[in-house]
Amino acid sequence: MGVDLESVSEATSGAIGSLLSTTILYPLDTCKSKFQAEVRARGQQKYRYLSDVMWEAISKGQVFSLYQGLGTKNFQSFISQFIYFYSYSYFKRVHSERTGSKSIGTKANLLIAAAAGACTSVLIQPLDTASSRMQTSEFGESKGLWKTLTEGSWADAFDGLGISLLLTSNPAIQYTVFDQLKQHLLKQKNAKAENGSSPVVLSAFMAFVLGAVSKSVATVLTYPAIRCKVMIQAADESKENETKKPRRRTRKTIPGVVYAIWRKEGMLGFFKGLQAQILKTVLSSALLLMIKEKITATTWILILAIRRTLFLTNTKGKLRSP
């Protein structure tokens, strides 16, 4: 069975786009994660606002610590996007071959996206857990990837996997909201258009706006799960009188973090850091798609050039052999 070059091209360009967008937005992501991970009663918070995380790093002279765990996060982003885009492209091709049609309906597309997301979540969960722990560690105290993962059992490396699988529904919610808004808007515009005129289509700007709105709605609806996941994966708080003897990591559960949020912060606590999450998610998605579109053609040309070079090399080798 030959290599699916189109899937490889899509996966590579998506992975590179994810790597660049992750690096650009990483300080914001670190501040967001540390802000989300803290759960304390009113008046005892270390971070009252998202900006407090940034000021803490500046006051401690640990500005570069806003990038702690960047290597692991980039590795995770590259691998996860490669797996996702390859899986998505592969499942899409298999569906087209079985149905005999290149067009894919909305429901089938959502199922394919969910399947690709589930495969990605299972395979990269240890990296996701490690990067979250490294980000939420005290500034200047972040550990390496291997040491972070070996603090607990291998089961601990898959902390939050259930929520990660649940969050694969996020794209389904986004596309459903986008489709409903699009149909409503086009219906209004077509009603105002004169009879006999060509059908109205969405402009690029309106498509971007509807995409941002639908992504924001999906983020709001799934945000309590997002915050619980960050808290489960977050590093344990360091104590000032803590000895240098290594401590076994405290295991966190979904019921445990839900109860902690409810008891200390109330209902609104489930939405703490929502604004930062929406800002980061929308910017990240926009950057990822923009960069991916710009480099897809170049990636495809490079892959074809490499394939052609390997083919010529193999051909020459066969001709020279007796």
From Swiss-Prot:
Family according to the record: Belongs to the mitochondrial carrier (TC 2.A.29) family.
Record GO biological process: ADP transport; ATP transport; fatty acid beta-oxidation; indolebutyric acid metabolic process; seedling development
Pfam family, one: Mito_carr
Domain of life: Eukaryota
UniProt subcellular location: Peroxisome membrane
Tissues with expression: Expressed in stamens, pollen grains, seeds, leaves, cotyledons, roots, stems, flowers, hypocotyls and siliques.
Transmembrane spans: 8-28, 104-124, 158-178, 201-221, 254-274, 286-306
SUPFAM superfamilies: Mitochondrial carrier
UniProt KW Membrane keyword: yes
InterPro entries according to UniProt: Mitochondrial_sb/sol_carrier, Mt_carrier_dom_sf, Peroxisomal_Ade_carrier
Keywords of this entry: Antiport, Membrane, Peroxisome, Repeat, Transmembrane, Transmembrane helix, Transport
Topological relation to the membrane, as annotated: Multi-pass membrane protein
GO MF term list: ADP transmembrane transporter activity; antiporter activity; ATP transmembrane transporter activity
Descriptive protein name: Peroxisomal adenine nucleotide carrier 1
Spans of repeat Solcar: 5-94, 104-184, 202-298
Role according to the record: Peroxisomal adenine nucleotide transporter catalyzing the counterexchange of ATP with AMP. ATP is needed by reactions that generate acyl-CoA for peroxisomal fatty acid beta-oxidation during postgerminative growth. Required for the beta-oxidation reactions involved in auxin biosynthesis and for the conversion of seed-reserved triacylglycerols into sucrose that is necessary for growth before the onset of photosynthesis.
Cellular component GO terms held in the UniProt record: peroxisomal membrane; peroxisome
Gene3D superfamilies in UniProt: Mitochondrial carrier domain (1.50.40.10)
